[in-house]
Amino acid sequence: MPRATTKTDLLASADGRFDRLWQLIDGMEEEIQRAPFAEEMAMMGKEAHWTRDKNLRDMLVHLYEWHQLLLHWIQANQAGERKPFLPEPYNWKTYPSMNVELWKKHQTTPLDKAKSMLKESHQAVMTLLVTFSDEELFTKGLFDWTGTSTLGSYAVSATASHYDWAMKKIKAHIKTSTK
């Protein structure tokens, strides 16, 4: 499915992929949901997340935290508080370090709590996104705080694209767990 360029497509792709993500998770045996990722998963790609995330919980809290980034960024800027998407001191070159800090923050978060947090944050994101028009979501430069991108592009990245990433990793976990 191509990247969303309308509000309707954004909402449909975010909800659709979120539903597919949960179908995949709910289809896993409890034992596999709670199992650590196989060591070979760390070798599946060059991106930092392949070595960072050790289990399903780590991935779910990552998605949750990126929802929080999106929500806080939009809410702050709408309230007139000029804020970048990534919190200080991070930028787009250093955000992998931020992801590690987010990972550390949740090492004692139980899987069941991670699941409920993610479901609640997805709903909060969807509730906020529905308040914007097509123009507000997909017109470059409409909000000065989105820089050279659009609000919709940030939303796609924090929802549908991130859910695709999670499904890819979960499928790899299932495959390596059932060998």
Indicate where each model-derived feature is located.
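Conserved H-X4-D acyltransferase segment
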Residues: 60
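Aromatic-glycine hotspot motif
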Residues: 1-57, 65-179
